[in-house]
Amino acid sequence: MAAAFDTAIIIKVMMVDALSMPKKGFRVDWSGLIDDRLDTFLEMGVLVLDDVFDHQDVLLLQKESGFIEYKAATLTQGERRQSIRGDDIRWIDEDCPIGMDYLDSIMSLAEYFNQALYAGIRRSEAHYACYPAGFGYQWHVDNPKGRDDRVISAVFYLNDDWQTTDGGEILVIDKTGKQQKLQPKANRLVIFDSNLKHQVNITHRYRFSIATWMRKDDRIL
């Protein structure tokens, strides 16, 4: 299938003036970034934002992702099959304070989508993911069969100096049927409809990211 990287919406993010930003990091003017591209996002179901956060915030996420303890990811049925999904994960919670700051920013993005699209998002969740060399994730959708609780998916990447020879791209079939092929380079946020089919190509080096979902269901305690 022909890659359609050039059709992806690549946005060079203009950060809010530093003097007007709160001391807490990960603050982005989502409305300013997306308003004039919203119709295209609705048509394609895919949005790509580059240089999203301040460099120091990205460094903090990279550091936290390197010190946490990962566990083998499983499929929806709780089964571990590395031939299908080869990443190790760590769900973000209060023990990941930098990740929680990231999630706060994602909830601001969710609030934007609620206002602009009446998306009905009520909460978000995320986990760090590490793919060792030689592994990927086969074609799938983020909503298990028969469910639609995940509304919008987002993946934030933490990999410096990523090269085309490193593999590990995310492939997304957008709403027009075209395949988006996107490198997992640091400070890139890929946003897409949670019902779109996507996969992670085999990576040839360690690949770090934060997988994120904006959901319309209530949290189950």
Residues of each region from the PLM?
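N-terminal amphipathic/basic-hydrophobic helices that include classical n-h-c signal peptides
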Residues: M1-M15
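Generic secretory/membrane-interface signal
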Residues: A3-D6, Q77, G134
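Extended interaction regions within the primary functional domain
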Residues: I9, L61-E64, I121
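N-terminal low-complexity, intrinsically disordered patches enriched in charged
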Residues: I11-V13, D54, L196
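Non-heme Fe(II)/2-oxoglutarate
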Residues: V16-A116
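Catalytic core of non-heme Fe(II) oxygenases with the double-stranded beta-helix
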Residues: I92-I202, Y206-I210, M214-L221
